[in-house]
Regions:
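Conserved class I S-adenosyl-L-methionine
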Residues: 187-198
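N-terminal auxiliary segments of SAM/dcSAM-dependent transferases
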Residues: 48-147
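C-terminal lobe and adjacent flexible extensions of AdoMet/dcAdoMet transferase-like proteins
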Residues: 361-495
């Protein structure tokens, strides 16, 4: 009698293998379950070879058909395709945190975009009628975003959008993913849904942030002409980054299964009911997954993102704000204006932006069509209760921003999240801060620089700070509270 392992081992089929021509031009139907079963067995024994599996499948399909089937099933099976065409168990460790600080938009992606531009307009795409048309599309996109108008994407608008936004969107997503990776909460092999994927900047940033040995099942939802650009840009990704583009609206698309990351990058402001859409996709989130929402730093889109966050994650609800705007007091949610954004180092100007900018009108400033500032608002939401920093206020120790009115002119101790870079235009540094209970804006104003209060300046966006002996004042001109950090104030970064 054979042992259990032998009983489960693959069996060779009797029929001969289909010829090359038949398999490549008219691929036979393949027993997908048999491919999966054989792969599950072999993965524990040796590298999974499509040539070998083909011998075990009824009808002996061509190895190329088996390989394609394995690629389609690789994420579910936890298999990584090697350069030699065989498949091995994927590394299941979380994605490591990266020192993400890109200096430039990668050349391979720049060349891919320029290929599209040359294919549509010719080698001199940036001059003449085509250049004028692209510049007009960029002007209109910027105006529509500023005014909050509906944004329409034809082929010219999609390419103009790609020229202007691919680099900064590429950079921004990596910084946001670091919030998850630093706590080992970013899967190395995620299933990703990119809602409103646009022309692919966030997808490419995600691709480059994850390690080379990751196995990714990436799905994009993009109904506009931007999907054509997205398709071309995704062609630059590695073989284990499997991509599918769904040309449907966010409202119409029906998620299939669960996703580890649901990404909304610069799309919430374009939806009629963004909170309802986010709620819909929260239902498709894995139990330990994250919704990652990113928006441009301008006032309207930034505040709009925070409004969505607050609507889908009310105080004591089932959705937790993981970062950056932590709620430090249980039972409270903020209701201030909510304009808050991070600032990272600028990118080098890519050649395609420089060329488009050189053809600007005489009355336009240099750099009108250059966009290398990396400034963005974001929100990471989870349903498992995880937070980037598990810090909460103690009423016996700290004042609460919800009750700041009664502390005016007093020195207090305060626990707060740093929610901006230096906003000052004068001598005193100014930083937006919050504790998740605030109804109006609060700002830390550093009037005296000391070693003991340096953390207010040195801390990163999203860090939690303890302020000791900070002076609370009301700023009537700004309609906000100023927390004065002077030589009597101690500021410590909690984490």
């Amino acid at each position: 009698m054979k042992g259990d392992a032998d009983a489960d081992a693959p069996r060779r089929a009797d029929s001969s293998r289909a010829g090359d021509g038949d398999s490549l031009h008219s691929p036979p139907m393949i027993d997908r379950d048999a491919v999966r079963d054989n792969a599950k067995y072999l993965r524990n024994v040796r590298p999974v070879d499509p040539d070998e599996i083909a011998d075990y499948i009824e009808g002996a399909p061509h190895p190329a058909v088996v390989k394609q089937t394995l690629r389609e099933e690789a994420h579910d099976l936890g298999l990584f395709e090697r350069d030699d065409g065989t498949f091995v168990p994927a590394n299941a460790d979380p994605a490591p945190v990266r020192n993400w600080s890109p200096a430039a938009f990668p050349d391979d992606y720049s060349f891919a975009l320029e290929d599209l531009l040359i294919g549509r307009y010719g080698a001199n795409w940036h001059v003449g009628e085509s250049g004028d048309r692209l510049r007009e599309r960029v002007r209109q996109l910027k105006e529509d975003y500023y005014r909050g108008n509906p944004v329409e994407y034809d082929e010219d608008a999609a390419l103009g959008y790609a020229i202007y936004h691919l680099p900064d969107y590429y950079a921004a997503v990596g910084y946001v993913l670091s919030d998850l990776a630093e706590r080992s909460l970013l899967p190395r092999n995620p299933r990703v849904l990119d809602v409103g994927a646009g022309t692919g900047g966030p997808a490419l940033g995600l691709h480059d942030y994850l390690p080379d040995d990751s196995v990714v099942d990436y799905h994009a939802v993009e109904p506009s002409a931007s999907a054509d650009v997205l398709d071309r840009m995704l062609g630059e990704t590695r073989r284990n980054f499997r991509t599918t583009v769904h040309r449907e609206t966010a409202e119409a698309f029906a998620p299939d299964g669960e996703y580890d990351i649901v990404l909304f990058a610069s799309v919430l402001s374009e939806l009629d009911d963004p909170a309802a859409v986010v709620r819909k996709y929260l239902d498709a989130l894995a139990a330990d997954g994250a919704v990652v929402a990113i928006a441009p730093a301008d006032r309207n889109t930034s505040i709009g993102l925070r409004e969505v966050e607050r609507e889908v994650a009310p105080a004591d609800g089932d959705v937790t704000v993981y970062s950056p705007a932590l709620r430090l007091w249980d039972g409270y949610a903020p209701s201030d204006r909510g304009w808050s954004f991070d600032v990272r180092p600028d990118l080098d100007v890519p050649g395609f932006q420089r060329r488009l900018d050189e053809g600007r009108a005489g009355d336009e400033d240099e750099g009108t069509f250059v966009n290398v500032d990396v400034q963005y608002s974001y929100s990471v939401l989870r349903t498992d209760g995880e937070r980037r920093l598990d810090v909460r206020g103690n009423p016996a120790r700290f004042a609460k921003m919800a009750e700041m009115e009664r502390h005016v002119t007093n020195r207090i101790d305060l626990l707060a999240v740093k929610l901006s870079h230096d906003l000052s235009e004068g001598n005193n540094q100014v930083f937006k801060i919050g504790d998740g209970s605030e109804a109006v804006d609060h700002y830390a104003v550093r009037t005296r620089d000391t070693v003991l209060n340096a953390d207010v300046a040195d801390a990163d966006y999203g860090d939690v700070l303890v302020f000791e002996n900070v002076l609370s004042l009301w700023n009537d001109d700004e309609g906000a509270y100023n927390l004065v950090v002077d030589d009597e104030t101690l500021v410590d970064r909690v984490a």
